Design a protein with these regions (language model features):
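Asp-based phosphoryl-transfer active-site loop
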Residues: 3-17, 219
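Phosphate- and divalent-cation-binding pockets in alpha/beta enzyme and binding domains
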Residues: 23, 47-51, 159, 191, ...
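Residue-level signal for inorganic ion chemistry
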Residues: 31, 42, 147, 192, ...
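Conserved acidic, metal-coordinating active-site core of Asp-based
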Residues: 92, 96-209, 213-218, 230
Length: 261
């Protein structure tokens, strides 16, 4: 019976300071040789997936926390908020003092006139690492799949959540400076369910690796969830853990699950 193995990207499969570890690449190659379906399951949209991750020989991708799903080159989902409502959303972000970049499956967009200190390093990193995909708001096509914000005033996050609630769910990362705003009705979990149905995988043969709170829907959906050794503490209290990305966590976890030797 075919198996489905899903990997979060940031902090699980990839970090800027260590890229994708060689041990993880070899482990994934072994999984594919064993006939398993291997997929990315990331909060990132396609425009900001690192090239080294894109080059992995995976079956497909769940991106943007479930707003984009592709299997063997076939796009199953490419969801976005469109039209005039996008301008209302932008007004709320400005009013709540939340510098942002808007994501969809094609590009990401930010306001070059609104880059306070809390947002400056992110903008520099994005422009350096993904120059072909960074666009200014003058080019924004009123199509939002996901928003990442760097709030100037975190005391207003409850207000932000309430005002965006008709269209979005908000994931607050206490350990990071940014928060993620996800199109309502979508998550990594909804993407996983869609892939399970499309590939006709037995749910008991599903596995997921993650490290942060946006991975929770994926970890709850698969039969076998495992978190990295340096994962968010609340996840480590709920799911078994492997070692960190710096200590061959993917390879060790796959061995612990009996998927590779």
């Amino acid at each position: 019976m075919a198996k489905l193995i899903l990997f979060d990207v940031d902090g699980t499969l990839y970090r800027r300071d260590c890229k994708v570890p060689e041990s993880a690449k070899k482990a994934i190659e072994t999984c594919i040789k064993n006939g398993y379906h291997v997929m990315l399951c990331t909060g990132r949209n396609h425009s900001i997936i690192p090239e080294e991750v894109r080059d992995l020989p995976v079956t497909g991708e769940i991106e943007g926390c479930g707003t984009y799903v592709s299997v063997n080159g076939k796009i199953l989902t490419d969801a976005a908020l469109t039209g005039a409502t996008c301008q209302e959303v932008l007004s709320i972000l400005y009013d709540c003092r939340c510098p942002f970049y808007i994501e969809n499956s094609d590009y990401f967009y930010y306001d070059e006139k609104y880059v306070p200190p809390v947002f400056a390093s992110a903008v520099q990193s994005m422009n350096t690492n993904y120059p072909g995909y960074a666009k200014h708001m003058g080019e924004f096509p009123s199509r939002i799949s996901k928003i990442t914000v760097y709030p100037e005033d975190r005391s207003r996050l409850a207000e932000l959540q309430k005002r965006l609630s008709p269209w979005f769910d908000v994931i607050i990362h206490e350990e990071y400076v940014y928060i993620e705003i996800i199109l309502k009705g979508y998550s990594k979990g909804t993407g996983v369910k869609q892939v399970i149905d499309y590939l006709a995988i037995d749910p008991k043969d599903t596995y997921g690796f993650g490290d942060s709170m946006n991975d929770l829907p994926m970890l709850e959906t698969v039969a076998h969830g495992i978190v990295m050794g340096d994962a968010t503490e609340s996840l480590k209290q709920r799911f078994p853990s492997t070692t960190s990305i710096y200590d061959n966590g993917i390879a060790n976890g796959l061995k612990e699950l009996g998927l590779i030797k």
